[in-house]
From Swiss-Prot:
This is NADH-quinone oxidoreductase subunit D. NDH-1 is composed of 14 different subunits. Subunits NuoB, C, D, E, F, and G constitute the peripheral sector of the complex. It is found in: Cell inner membrane. It is an enzyme of class 7 (translocase). SUPFAM superfamilies: HydB/Nqo4-like. PANTHER family: NADH DEHYDROGENASE [UBIQUINONE] IRON-SULFUR PROTEIN 2, MITOCHONDRIAL, NADH-UBIQUINONE OXIDOREDUCTASE 49 KDA SUBUNIT. It is a peripheral membrane protein. One of its GO terms (molecular function) is quinone binding. Belongs to the complex I 49 kDa subunit family. NDH-1 shuttles electrons from NADH, via FMN and iron-sulfur (Fe-S) centers, to quinones in the respiratory chain. The immediate electron acceptor for the enzyme in this species is believed to be a menaquinone. Couples the redox reaction to proton translocation (for every two electrons transferred, four hydrogen ions are translocated across the cytoplasmic membrane), and thus conserves the redox energy in a proton gradient. The gene is nuoD.
């Protein structure tokens, strides 16, 4: 019997029989280590820093540090006119600028008690759903890269390019649109826009199914996401989760259905939630599946809007746009279903100024990120990357 001393780690006693070494006893101890991920790190989406307390490869706690993209959005809003705030909202969730514009305008129009022309409402929904699909394609493509798959990223951005080209044709911009105005739109859609959108829908529907199968039928992708980062429905509700994050936990909640705005009450679409067959309800794979299934529902909504949209003769997209926005004294909370969840605006008016007394943004990304401690506890460090990617956060909206 031979005993070897190992500094700080007890002893390792070895027994030699012929040429074979057999380990009889091993006393090893571990100690916790602080691991900093970010703010510039391949695993983080945007400028986010995670301070992780680890025991070996196991994460015992992950604390997010925010504020690297803080731009004083809410304070700026108190010093500009109501319509001038719209371009600021584009720069919050810059991957879904039109959806952010929609949420803000819904709130201001509610405060003003404005009636919006029907054609404007249909156009708003069409461009919002196109923007939703483009945003989900970024989420799915970058998530695949996070987990080591490069090909799906190329497919996603190939098809996203078609959407950005259509939005550029309609709005004049690819990302920061300033298209939805308080009371109307900057422009009507160009002639032939509806036909081009329908052509894209017919082209993209089989591509979306192919993309879904490419990942959900990939054994490596499933093993990296199934059963990882599980969030029970009751805990998700207590955190205030919304959007695909909440639906991924099995809660069928969608503001377009549960608290409808615009012309969504007239449209027929499903609110997908995981059934537990492919994934564990509430895990990373469930959240991915919800985003993939929502793409098909957005295509259905677009088709219905084009079919029901009123004609263009004599249409002025700015007919209901007020020349000067000075709401009566009061307060309002308006919200919309963004690709990442509920984006809401609490606006307070003093009845005198053309600027809001207070404009508070309720960010879905900030709320979703707040659950990082619970999601990461007990997970392995490589799984932490899968969890962060499943949140689909945009730090421009988190920090504002």
């Amino acid at each position: 019997m031979q005993e070897l001393e190992m500094a700080g780690q007890g002893s390792l006693r070895l027994s030699r029989k012929s040429d074979t070494i057999v380990v009889l006893e091993k006393d090893l101890s571990t100690e916790q280590m602080v691991l900093s991920m970010g703010p510039q790190h391949p695993s983080t989406h945007g400028v986010l820093r995670l301070e992780c307390l680890t025991d070996g490869e196991v994460v015992t706690e992950a604390e997010p540090y925010l504020g690297y993209l803080h731009r004083c959005f809410e304070k700026h809003c108190e010093h500009v006119d109501y319509p001038a705030i719209v371009p600021y909202t584009d720069r919050m969730d810059y991957l879904a600028g039109i959806n952010s514009e929609m949420a803000y305008c819904v709130a201001v129009e509610k405060l003003l008690d404005l009636e919006i022309p029907r054609r404007v409402e249909f156009i708003r929904v069409i461009v919002s759903e196109l923007n939703r699909i483009a945003s989900h394609l970024v989420a799915i493509g970058t998530y695949a890269i996070d987990l080591g798959a490069f090909t799906p990223f190329l497919f996603c951005f190939r098809d996203r390019e078609h959407i950005l080209n259509m939005l550029e044709w309609a709005t004049g911009a690819r990302m920061l649109y300033n298209y939805i105005w308080v009371g109307g739109l900057a422009y009507d859609v160009p002639a032939g826009f509806n036909e081009r959108v329908l052509e894209f829908v017919n082209y993209f529907r089989p591509k979306a199914l192919e993309l879904q199968q490419l990942l959900t039928e990939n054994e490596i992708f499933v093993k990296r996401t199934k059963g990882i980062g599980i969030m029970p429905a009751d805990v998700a509700i207590n955190y205030g989760w919304s959007g695909p994050m909440l639906r991924g936990s099995g809660v069928q909640w969608d503001i377009r259905r549960n608290d409808p705005y615009s012309i969504y009450p007239e449209l027929d679409f499903a609110v997908p939630v995981p059934d537990g067959k492919l994934s564990v309800v509430g895990d990373c794979l469930s959240r991915h599946l919800v985003r993939a299934l929502e793409i098909e529902e957005s295509l259905k909504i677009i088709e219905q809007c084009i079919d029901k949209m009123p004609g263009t003769q004599g249409f002025d997209p700015r007919s209901a746009v007020p020349k000067r926005v000075r709401p009566k004294a009061g307060e309002v909370y308006g919200r919309a279903e963004n690709p990442r969840g509920e984006l809401g605006f609490y606006i307070q008016s003093d009845g005198k100024s053309t600027s809001p007394l207070r404009c508070k943004a309720r960010s879905s990304c900030f709320v979703n990120l707040s659950a990082m401690k619970d999601l990461s506890r007990g997970q392995l460090i490589p799984d932490l990357v899968a969890i962060i990617g499943s949140l689909d956060i945009v730090l421009g909206e988190v920090d504002r």
